[in-house]
Amino acid sequence: MQEIKIRCRGIITHGGKTLFVQHTERDFYNLPGGHIDYGEDPQECIERELLEELGVRGDVGRLLYVHTFKNSAGEQTVEFFFAIENGADFLSHEALEKTHAHEIAEVVWLTPEDTHLDIRPKCIEEFFQKGTLVHGETVRFLKS
């Protein structure tokens, strides 16, 4: 039986910049987040993931994107992207205790001009570069 993987990601912005993470053993940058645990709802998932990876309790805002894709192994994934409303709280994340810090190689604040970096998923890159990652009133459904 085929399973669908479910992940949640947080879009954290402050002062025109967006927070991205580079996981260990990866050569690209992604929005923080991870897989949903059994019994969790998507909001609980992103709250837990932000605490684990960055040591900050995120103020989860509205759902911005739903992204579906199949990876090279044919596994299907659905990702939920939420606005995180307390971006300033993440500015000093280095000093905070993280339970899963070993999973993160680097945390960076990027501007839309940082086009030389490999940002994923590619389907959000256009919105990021235009500065419209958290704009709009409706949920955007993306497929890649």
Please place each PLM-identified region on the residue numbering.
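A structural signal for short, well-ordered beta-strand segments
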Residues: 10, 63, 82-84
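Short, hydrophobic secondary-structure boundary micro-motifs
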Residues: 21, 92-94, 136-137
